[in-house]
A protein has these predicted regions:
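Membrane-embedded, hydrophobic transmembrane alpha-helices
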Residues: 1-83
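Membrane-embedded helix bundles of polyisoprenyl
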Residues: 2-5, 93-103, 144, 153, ...
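Hydrophobic core of alpha-helical transmembrane segments in multi-pass integral membrane proteins
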Residues: 21-34, 91-101, 313-318
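Membrane-interface junctions at the ends of membrane-embedded or membrane-associated helices
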Residues: 7, 32-46, 74, 232-262, ...
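Conserved small/polar residues in nucleotide/adenosyl-binding loops
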Residues: 321-322
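Short hydrophobic/aromatic helix or loop-helix immediately within or flanking a transmembrane segment
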Residues: 136-159
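Extracytoplasmic loop-helix module adjacent to an early transmembrane segment
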Residues: 98-134, 234
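Membrane-interfacial entry segments at the cytosolic side of transmembrane helices
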Residues: 13-21, 78-88, 254-259, 297-312
Length: 322
């Protein structure tokens, strides 16, 4: 989305039609290309069922019963234990979401304000994107502004409304990133959620979390700090497995390693694209990962891939600012 908005802004053709087409078009083309041999049969099946429904050959109740049966067979039959496990985890996650909403959400109801003095400036910059006037006040990391502008332009939500409620939404994702990171280092199934519940408790210095009540670029970029670090850790773990794996397993493990590196590059570049302070934090985490895996990091086969990915992530973010 960020690259798409940058491209359309530079061409001065950014609007709801071009943004929607640029978002849906590539996925639709890929979907059609992959399923091009099955599409005629699917269209014929849909038209046949619609015709039978409209002609009265098949009643509405019969169609609904068949649809319900299809959904049951695909998602529920023989999966009772799986759903029980999922529901238990969803209940714990729901408690965490409720706690986050209780701590960070009252602003939406009680004050309905911006909660930070610099948000009106960001609001002005986002409004200028409506006029295809990017970087109206100089070059600045515009990742956050582009996301708000995209939501405003495509879905028709007023910018000032988004800036008043988006702070809680982005905080959900920050904590979700924390859950993912804790799942990597904790053996207990519910320990990550307990860690989130402990952190969200209102027992710390208010200055440590007050800014999360507002929609701010620096806090938004924190979503990508832990995610990029997690991908770096997973690369080292997966690459070690690849070196010891059988030949028939190496190809799949190598693809996993490449995918982790790509995600690391994207995550790290997004921190710089959104706010450079978060890049400093992510850099410190990366140094910690390098120290933790120092014996592997120092080997050329690890080092060259990590360095190439790091340079690529910086170039991706710099390219967005050039």
């Amino acid at each position: 989305i960020i690259y798409l908005v940058y491209l359309l802004q530079f061409l001065h053709i950014s609007n709801r039609v071009t943004l929607t087409a640029g978002t849906v078009g590539p996925f639709l083309l890929v979907w059609i290309w992959k399923r091009r041999s099955k599409i005629p049969g699917v269209i014929e099946w849909v038209l046949e069922n619609v015709e039978r429904l409209l002609s009265g050959e098949r009643g509405k109740k019969t169609s609904l019963v068949q649809l319900r049966g299809t959904i049951y067979r695909r998602f529920f039959r023989g999966k009772r234990k799986q759903w029980l496990n999922v529901l238990l985890e969803l209940a714990v996650m729901g408690a965490a979401i409720a706690a986050i909403t209780y701590v960070y959400g009252p602003n939406m109801i009680e004050a309905y304000g911006y909660k930070a003095s610099d948000i009106p400036v960001h609001n002005y910059w986002i409004n200028e994107l409506d006029r295809n006037n990017i970087w109206v006040a100089g070059v600045y990391p515009y990742g956050f502004h582009i996301v708000i502008y995209y939501l405003h332009m495509v879905f028709g939500i007023k910018t000032y409304v988004l800036l008043r409620i988006f702070g809680v939404v982005q905080t959900y994702f920050v904590y979700l990133a924390m859950v993912v990171a804790l799942k990597m280092v904790c053996k207990g199934r519910f320990t990550p959620y307990l860690g989130v519940l402990f952190y969200v408790m209102d027992i710390f210095n208010r200055n440590t979390y007050a800014r999360f009540e507002g929609a701010l670029p620096q806090e938004f970029s924190m979503i990508f700090i832990l995610t990029s670090v997690c991908m770096a850790i997973r690369f080292f773990q997966e690459f070690a497995k690849e070196q010891k794996a059988e030949e028939n397993e190496k190809k799949e493990l190598d693809q996993n390693c490449r995918w982790y590196l790509i995600q690391f590059a994207i995550g790290f570049s997004l921190t710089l694209t959104i706010h450079f302070y978060s890049t400093m934090i992510a850099g410190l985490f990366c140094i910690g990962v390098a120290v933790g895996f120092c014996f592997r990091f120092a080997r050329w086969k690890y080092f060259r891939r990590i360095m190439a990915t790091g340079i690529l992530s910086v170039l991706l973010s710099v390219d967005r600012k050039s």
